[in-house]
């Protein structure tokens, strides 16, 4: 299974990912951060069409190469950031629409292999030196991710769950979801 943790910056995805220990699963990287650090790819409000396609294609590659993976973010996230960039003229609408279509195609083709876990905004942003600290930007991204998650649920029949509450409550809910989906934790 591909367990995809999705949500805007600073919503607790990485915290939960780092607490999961599932035999046979690899921990995927947060692709945008990795590409930014290793290749200088522009992210957040500074992104552009080239950077978004690099990030998108890297996620597709990572999901295609790994049967069992826990991913910090997914295609719904990349498409949300791309929509923001299109509204700012930093990405073409044609490129955005093509990416959104490819997102739907990927999720439809892999619908039986994906568990989508959505993290809404519940916490104040913490400055880690990489994430954007702009609250309006985060709120925009959070809303667009939520729309994308709803769309893939309807279009592709993807199982999607929302995690809320304290870290302890989120882990209890995550354990329940994994048990429900037949994924055994250590």
Feature map (PLM): residue ranges:
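Short loop/turn segments at strand-loop or loop-helix junctions that form parts
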Residues: 32, 73-75, 117-123
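Conserved lysine of the Walker
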Residues: 13
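A glycine- and Lys/Arg-enriched "phosphate-lid" helix/loop adjacent to the NTP-binding pocket
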Residues: 85-168
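Walker A (P-loop) phosphate-binding loop of P-loop NTPases
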Residues: 10
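Hydrophobic anchor at the beta1->P-loop junction of P-loop NTPases
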Residues: 5
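Glycine-rich phosphate-binding loop used to anchor ATP phosphates in small-molecule kinases
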Residues: 52-111
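Conserved substrate/cofactor phosphate-moiety recognition/catalytic segment
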Residues: 18-61
């Amino acid at each position: 299974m591909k367990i995809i943790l999705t949500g805007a910056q600073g919503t607790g995805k990485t915290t939960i990912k780092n607490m999961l220990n599932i035999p046979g699963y690899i921990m995927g990287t947060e692709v945008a951060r990795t590409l930014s650090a290793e290749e200088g790819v522009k992210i957040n409000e500074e992104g552009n069409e080239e950077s978004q396609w690099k990030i998108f294609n890297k996620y597709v590659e990572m999901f295609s190469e790994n049967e069992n993976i826990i991913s910090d973010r997914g295609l719904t996230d990349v498409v949300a950031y791309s929509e923001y960039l299109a509204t700012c003229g930093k990405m073409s609408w044609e490129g955005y629409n093509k990416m959104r279509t490819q997102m739907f195609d990927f999720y439809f083709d892999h619908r039986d292999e994906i568990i989508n876990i959505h993290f809404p905004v519940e916490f104040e942003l913490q400055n880690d030196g990489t994430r954007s600290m702009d609250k309006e930007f985060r709120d925009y991204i959070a809303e667009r991710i939520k729309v994308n998650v709803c769309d893939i649920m309807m279009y592709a029949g993807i199982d999607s769950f929302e995690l809320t509450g304290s870290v302890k409550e989120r882990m209890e809910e995550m354990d329940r979801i994994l048990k429900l989906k037949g994924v055994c934790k250590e």
